[in-house]
Amino acid sequence: MKRQNLPRTTLALALAAAFGQTLAAAPLLEMETVEVIGTTPLPGVGLAREQIAGNVQTAKSRDLEDAANLNLPDLMNRRLGSVFINEVQNNPFQPDVNYRGFTASPLLGTPEGLSVYLDGVRLNQPFGDVVSWDLIPRSAIASLSLMPGSNPVFGLNTLGGAIALQTKDGYSHPGAAIQATYGSYQRRSVEFEIGGHNDKGLHWFTTGNLFRENGWRDDSPSDVRQWFGKLGWMDARTDLSLSLAVAGNKLTGNGLQEQRLLANDYSSVYTKPDETRNNAFSLNLAGKHSVNDDLLLSGNAYYRKIRTTTYNGDINEDALDQSVYQPSAAERTALANAGYSGFPTSGANAANTPYPYWRCIANVLLNDEPAEKCNGLINRTETRQENYGLSGQFSYFGKLAGMKNQFTGGGGYDASRVRFRQSAQFGYINPDHSITPVNFYADGSELDDNGNPIDSRVDLRGRSQTWSIYATDTLSLAEIWHLTLSGRYNETRIVNRDQLTPGGGSGSLDGDHRFSRFNPAIGLSVTPSRALNVYAAYNEGSRTPTTIELGCADPANPCKLPNAMAGDPPLKQVVTKTWEAGLRGVLGAKTQWNAGVFRAENQDDILFVADNQAGYGYFKNFGKTRRQGVELGLDSSLGAFDWGVNYTYIDATFQSEETVNGAANSSNDASSKGLDGNIVIRPGDRMPLIPKHLFKAHADWRINGAWSLGLGMQAVSGSFARGNENNQHQADGTYYLGSGKSAGYAIFDLGAKYRANRQLSFFAQINNLFDRQYSTAAQLGATGFGAGGNFVARPFAAVGGNYPLISSTFLAPGAPRTGWVGVRYEFGK
């Protein structure tokens, strides 16, 4: 079906002009409270909301302190419009945060379309542009601004938006507090904060957090340790500060689960473990100085070091079409000679051997085919990153041709060093779906059926440098008209050196890449009355290809998986062009509303496409994708009640044709069901993991001076699974299981707070109040387990020498009903 286009920005401009003419005679009323919002990564003076041509959203520290918000993604998911979460990793500190269909994720290989800044330091990491949410301490955040669109001032990866965070200091948050919580699944946490200043201008702030839980899914504990400190000095014109952040976290997120196994046991896991350890250290020296009433200087210099290791137990999909049950005579002899006993002498099959392992062990002893006979795999990675840089900007406030004008210009330099290592060790699956490793590695010592070495090793060193300059100017054409022009030029160099296959050429990851681009933006805002503000904007943003994408972009050397790097040819930058228009205003004294439309088109988007060799592919630039939609919001206060609603419609579609691997998709072009094949994406097909409809509501009731209650609701429509990019998958109950979608859902949360006095308060929180079983994401894939959880290889007879497999829909389950209670004591009040 042909998609109907959204109105052009010119229509909104005409609408703004019409409102300006109609209401020109009305007297201009000043807002009682003017909220100033920073419009650059570095702290500056900022602009009033009514001067910003976009649906910017903000939150304060008191919002983060709400007991319902475990971390920053929780707050954004519950309260900010157009934000939703995919829990692909299934750990509360490792979500994919999506805004208007663009993502900030901690998972390598995810296209990162949102930039995140903390006190002017870009948190997107050098390797993969990922964002590790567990490294951001909730209790250190003073404010959050979600800037919409491809705002070029915020630099690379600002395709759909930018998240700008500012931390607390001793002036903004003096005093001390300690808080403790305990709840479901052995969740317990303790956090503290201390802030203050003296009459000499010295100020200080420190906070720490210790969080542990067993997790609601099997074998999914987490241990989070965060500390943040800031020391500074301030006088009437100058503010200097040095901040330090340290984190040491161990996270277990056991990921997606096959739909039948999830229906049998909602807490079950497909394979385990899936552990991530993050250790991080960062320093940031920041300052600003007011030269005079018209000129403000600001800047920072930072250093950050992160070490990430992963240990993942997975199924070896290359064993699914193999004979893995009955050891041969030679294998039985090898087992006996090695001292093993108890192995079957004949007749072993899927019915009587639910978890086979003897052929795996025997093939390791014989150095024969363990890569095919071992049904388990242990994947290990280590990433070491160092990045550092400095930036500076100036803001000038004056007049241009007699009109008020605010100009900000700046520049920055960012550099990084990265080393990434990956290995894979074979093993076998146990009854609890853990993996027992054996002494055989995917290190190139064995060939596959096509004669290619089985080698999953990666050892890559990389360096990058980015120079940038930017400027933004807001000109008040009249008292109610504000025109903003912005632009940023980025020049990035990425140098990769393969430690296993140096020197370039086929299969080498060596590469030297340069990317540069100027991204412009223009916005117009008009405020004809206190009750109405109209805006329209156009902006552009870009991102450079990641090392993961560059490392698997060679058609002559396709990869089995996106992270099985094999070559390093050039890719183009992804460029996003965003149009946005809307209205916002107030009704009475305590009601605010907004309505807007947006369209973002990605050019040269990067997609993992299929190769002629079954199951293989490579990254390439893919025509166009489009994300467009409508946003509506309403917030109000009525006596002791505060309430609000947000609705978003997102139409996210592919706009070009491409062939991609669709082995688990029922509509693929394979000669027989259950075999490997490709699917064709066509313009208009909906993009996976992006729901069409989002609705959020919340209500807070201040019962009296001591008691308060809060109720929240999130409703999300269904979305297509990864692997179902053509939207054509249909279950047949035999070869293909599940709908290829995740269903829509609505969940509620309820919180209560009791303030005993100015210092002491108690709180309780219940999330997923009605214990709804739901999923936030889905993916198609071959399954190695039957409905009862037993391993099954060769589930069907061979067709033309190939063995069909069972493919299913894998789901990312949401947390069941969970509750916790807590106490907070604030000193000095």
Predicted regions and their residues:
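Membrane-embedded beta-barrel scaffold of Gram-negative outer-membrane proteins
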Residues: S290, L296-Y302, I306-D314, T527, ...
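Gram-negative outer-membrane beta-barrel transporters
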Residues: S391-Y396, A478-E479, K590-Q603, Y618-E725, ...
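Transmembrane beta-barrel wall of Gram-negative outer-membrane proteins
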Residues: Y182-R212, R217-N254, P273-L296, S486-R488
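A beta-strand signature from Gram-negative outer-membrane beta-barrel systems
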Residues: L123-Q125, D134-A177, S189, E826
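C-terminal beta-signal and adjacent terminal beta-strands/loops
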Residues: S542, A715-N727, K753-K829
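Face-selective signature of the C-terminal outer-membrane beta-barrel domain
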Residues: D239, N279-Y311, I315-E317, D321-Q499, ...
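Periplasmic plug
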Residues: Q89, Q94-P148
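Surface-exposed extracellular loop regions of Gram-negative outer-membrane beta-barrel proteins
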Residues: G248-A263, R417, R493-L500, D512, ...
